[in-house]
Each structure stands twice: as structure tokens, then as C-alpha cells.
């Protein structure tokens, strides 16, 4: 069965969501393998527009399913809001999404830390402020939370206490959300995920499923924002290229095709090198016509 990866070939915002949405009619599974809510993928159903930051760009009107892999950093509150929007028009669609329990959680502390770090930098990198960098940092430093921790209240409290005190010591300040408030917040999100009937399934189990069916791997951002191959340090913190499918247990050698998406003109969000930047009224016209805001 066919395995296809769709990735951005510029700085993101190339229209990957539309491409994925178009091809989704031919694939049973749409898989996000990296990134977080700093990505924005637009899909259309008829004349109605949906913008997802975390959810894979499945086609709501056919029986395709979505999987969020372990390489992602997930703002669970944002995820639930996206599910609720789709549920209004497509009741029961949440049960067609599957989460890897090994995926990392973006906490409100990460967002606060993101903005704090940007203020401290001599040269700002243009962060989106969504906590992506600090979340990936905690993941690499083994200091954060994965989704499976939500189902163990004792472990959840222990981890939150450890994370909070580590950050308080690091920045010599208290954070806006207390440990108790964070605990209540996360327990509420867990209950909401259960109410929406979202599935939790490991990549090991999903790999067996994916081997025997058609899968479209949906990339986030673009190659020039990739942590290893982008315009460092003005990059994102995750894998933007096809090699990121390894977080779902796949090798690039198992892919039948990799499609790189471009648009006729180039845009980028935030700071960093942009050799073809057009600062005249022509650039303004392109922004206006292309709705690049």
C-alpha cells in the first residue's frame, strides 16, 4: 500500500494542508510526525474553511483517520479546541483521531518560558510564543511530560512539582500558573479527551496497521526551518523533512514518494535570513493578494 510524505520546500506556509487535503481521498491514514501548534494547515470542505494547528489534515467527509506521532509536541488545550470546531459540523469525528501516548505535552509554563527567553536574547529569533522550543528542550533534557503521564495522577503530580521547581530555580522567578492550577488544568484536558472519544495508540501498534494500508505523512513548516538543515538559529525545533517519519517507526526507504510543496513567491514568519524579501509596494501587493498575514 502506498506511503507518501508531503513536506514544505520553503519556510512553511506553502499550502501543504491543501495538498494533503486533496490527496487524502486516496489514503486511509494522515499522519503528523513532528512539530506543534506553530504550524497552520488549512483545509476546505465545500466553501467552508478549517485551520488546524495540530490535527492532521484528514478529509472529514470520507472515512480517513489521523494519527499524531511521538515526534510532536502537543498543546492539548489547542488540540481540544480544534476537535470541538470539527465536531460542530462532523459529529463523532474525534473518534477518527489517534494520539501516540509518547507524544510530548506543551504546558502553559512552556509558553511563558518561550516569551521570557525571547526577551533575554540579544538577537530575537522571532518565536511564535507557542512554547515549541522550550517543550522540545524539556523533551531532550528529560524534564517534561508525555501524554501517558496524564493517566497516572500520582506520577503527574510528581512530574509537575519537579518541572516547576526546575524552572523556578533556572529563572529565579515564580510562574503565572501554580502546580495545583496546572494539575487541575491537565486533569480537565484528560477528561475532555475521554469525552470526545479520542484514541490513544502507540506507534508500535500503529506500525502494524500502517504496514498494510495507505499512509500520507504530513510535514510541518519547511526545509529552511528544519533544525538541522534550515537557516540556524532562525529555525524551528523539530524535523521538517521526510526523515521525521522515524518518530512513527518508519524509514524514508519505506516511502514510495516524497512531495515538496512550493508556492510561486516565498514568505517566512519571524526573524532570520530572507534574501528575496520585497519591502516595496510590490511586496505589499503580494501580501494583500495572497492573504499572507
Predicted regions and their residues:
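Non-transmembrane, aqueous-exposed alpha-helical and coiled segments at domain scale
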Residues: 1-293
Amino acid at each position: 500500500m502506498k506511503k507518501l510524505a508531503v513536506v514544505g520546500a520553503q519556510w512553511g506556509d506553502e499550502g501543504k494542508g491543501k495538498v494533503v487535503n486533496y490527496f487524502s481521498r486516496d489514503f486511509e491514514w494522515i499522519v503528523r510526525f513532528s512539530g506543534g501548534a506553530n504550524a497552520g494547515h488549512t483545509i476546505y470542505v465545500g466553501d467552508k474553511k478549517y485551520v488546524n494547528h495540530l490535527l492532521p489534515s484528514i478529509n472529514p467527509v470520507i472515512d480517513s483517520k489521523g494519527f499524531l506521532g511521538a515526534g510532536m509536541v502537543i498543546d492539548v488545550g489547542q488540540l481540544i479546541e480544534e476537535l470541538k470546531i470539527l465536531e460542530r459540523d462532523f459529529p463523532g469525528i474525534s473518534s477518527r483521531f489517534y494520539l501516540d501516548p509518547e507524544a510530548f505535552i506543551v504546558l502553559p509554563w512552556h509558553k511563558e518560558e518561550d516569551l521570557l527567553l525571547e526577551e533575554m536574547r540579544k538577537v530575537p529569533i522571532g518565536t511564535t510564543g507557542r512554547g515549541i522550543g522550550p517543550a522540545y528542550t524539556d523533551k531532550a533534557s528529560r524534564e517534561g511530560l508525555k501524554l501517558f503521564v496524564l493517566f497516572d495522577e500520582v506520577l503527574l503530580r510528581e512530574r509537575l512539582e519537579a518541572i516547576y521547581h526546575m524552572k523556578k530555580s533556572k529563572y529565579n522567578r515564580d510562574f503565572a500558573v501554580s502546580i495545583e492550577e496546572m494539575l487541575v488544568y491537565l486533569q480537565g484536558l484528560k477528561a475532555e479527551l475521554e469525552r470526545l472519544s479520542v484514541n490513544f495508540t502507540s506507534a508500535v501498534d500503529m506500525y502494524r496497521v500502517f504496514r498494510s494500508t495507505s499512509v500520507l505523512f504530513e510535514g510541518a513548516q519547511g526545509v529552511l526551518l528544519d533544525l538541522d538543515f534550515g537557516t540556524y538559529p532562525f529555525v524551528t525545533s523539530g524535523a521538517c523533512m521526510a526523515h521525521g517519519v522515524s518518530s512513527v517507526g518508519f524509514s524514508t526507504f519505506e516511502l514510495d514518494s516524497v512531495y515538496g510543496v512550493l508556492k510561486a513567491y516565498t514568505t517566512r514568519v519571524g526573524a532570520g535570513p530572507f534574501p528575496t524579501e520585497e519591502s516595496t509596494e510590490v511586496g505589499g501587493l503580494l501580501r494583500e493578494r495572497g492573504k499572507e498575514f
